[in-house]
Regions:
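Bacterial N-terminal signal peptides
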Residues: 48-59
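The serine-hydrolase catalytic nucleophile loop
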Residues: 124-135
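A short, Lys/Arg-enriched amphipathic alpha-helix followed by its capping loop at the start of a domain
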Residues: 134-144, 182
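Flexible "cap/lid" subdomain of the alpha/beta-hydrolase fold that forms the substrate-access gate
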Residues: 64-94, 102-105, 110, 117, ...
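Catalytic histidine-centered segment of alpha/beta-hydrolase-like enzymes
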Residues: 354-367
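Short beta-strand element of the alpha/beta-hydrolase
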Residues: 115-122
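Conserved alpha/beta-hydrolase "nucleophile elbow" surrounding the catalytic nucleophile
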Residues: 122-124, 192-193
Length: 380
């Protein structure tokens, strides 16, 4: 059996496997284990609203003894492959602005135009810059055509006034769909993170036959992985029912005071590049951007009622599914990753020692996982 790499744990099968592995932990020598421990009770700020993010604390074994494996073989497939960083180099991307519905949308693109296409949808408050290194490595393989755009008001895209452009997930998804049409992208694999997940599942709903495969990274369609939204009376759900203008004003103030990344204030660690944060700071200083982001955050509450429909949609799709998750995510816990197995029992689940923006922390591992996943399937 392959040994667990330092960066990744892979499970394929049913969530019940986790409990079974916990019970068998005492049978595995210490040197053959790897433990992932996740912070509990961290207080995090998300768009001006304090939310309590209680992360899942879980211990998973790197090896399973033969008795356990035999007992599980008819119900679940378990494998722990070694994940090595990609060493094929970086291919240069090209950049541009595509005009869609009168809005200039920035995009990054690379790889052979005739290769299977991977569309990457970013989270918030970042932009397509979060995929830069991953895209360079995937383009260098010569086996994928990769493209990622910035949503309106994010990154280098235009920021139309929120009184003229409705910043809702429905509207952003419509804009993304029009962007894909403008770029003549008809069939693609979808990589979705954070806000990209509710945007992406709207695209899947609208055109399920356009999807060749699905890759989800730290984004939920199950409340399992979203502790702050589980209680109907939580601060978050109250905000989504009745917008809190005081919280909005506090966020606007904090956004305006975000400091220039420097040695004096950088707390993200050596693996997290400051370029992403600098672009976010500059982009948010444009007129109307904070209002746009607050409108979209308020509309996030429209996503939870759609979770059951998206879960059923995923069950009905006959496409490969990969889930990549940074275990140190204070917003969406690992339970959200495992929940995808209920709807896609054959999904590959990769748990990384990274945070919410794992593509910035560990792009080599993620590029390797995506390249391996896409190469194992006959994608169009």
């Amino acid at each position: 059996m392959a040994k667990l790499s330092p960066s990744s744990l892979v499970l394929q099968g049913q969530p019940e496997l986790i409990a079974c592995l916990r019970r068998q932990r005492s049978n595995v020598p210490e040197r053959k284990r790897r433990e992932f421990s996740f912070p509990k009770g961290d207080m995090v700020r998300n768009i001006g609203v304090w939310i309590i993010a209680t992360a899942l604390s879980v211990t998973v074994q790197a090896q399973v003894n033969p008795t356990t494996r035999d007992a599980l073989q008819h119900a679940v497939s378990f494998h722990v492959p070694t994940v090595a960083p990609m060493r094929s180099g970086h291919a240069a991307l090209h950049f541009g602005w595509q005009t869609v519905d009168g809005i200039h949308l920035f995009y990054r693109e690379g790889g052979p135009a005739n290769a299977p296409t991977l569309v990457l949808l970013h989270g918030s408050p970042t932009s397509s810059i979060m995929y830069q290194t991953v895209m360079e490595q995937l383009a260098a393989t010569g086996k994928l055509h990769v493209i990622a755009m910035d949503y309106p008001s994010y990154g280098y895209s235009d920021a139309p006034d929120h009184r003229q452009y409705s910043y809702t997930f429905d509207h952003i998804a419509q804009t993304v769909a029009h962007f894909l049409v403008a770029r003549d992208i008809q069939q693609y694999t979808l990589y979705m993170q954070d806000y990209g997940v509710p945007i992406g599942f709207r695209l899947i709903q609208a055109a399920p036959n356009s999807i060749s495969a699905i890759i989800v990274q730290n984004g939920v369609i199950h409340l399992d992985g979203f502790p702050a939204a589980q209680d109907p009376d939580s601060m978050l759900n109250k905000y989504w029912r009745t917008r809190d203008l005081a919280s909005d004003q506090q966020f606007a103030k904090e956004a305006a005071q975000m400091p220039f990344p420097s040695s004096a204030n950088w707390t993200q660690g050596p693996n997290f590049p400051p370029d992403n944060e600098l672009l976010t700071i500059i982009s948010q200083q444009r007129p109307g951007v904070v209002d746009a982001h607050l409108d979209l955050w308020f509309d996030y509450g429209s996503n939870m009622p759609l979770y059951p429909a998206w879960q059923n949609l995923l069950k009905s799709l006959n496409v490969p599914v990969e889930v990549i998750w940074g275990s140190r995510d204070n917003y969406f816990t690992v339970a959200g990753a495992l929940a995808y197995l209920r709807d896609a029992p054959k999904a590959e689940i990769h748990i990384l020692d990274a945070g919410h923006f794992a593509t910035l922390e560990d792009p080599d591992a993620i590029a390797a996982l995506v390249a391996g996943f896409t190469s194992r399937h006959d994608l169009r």
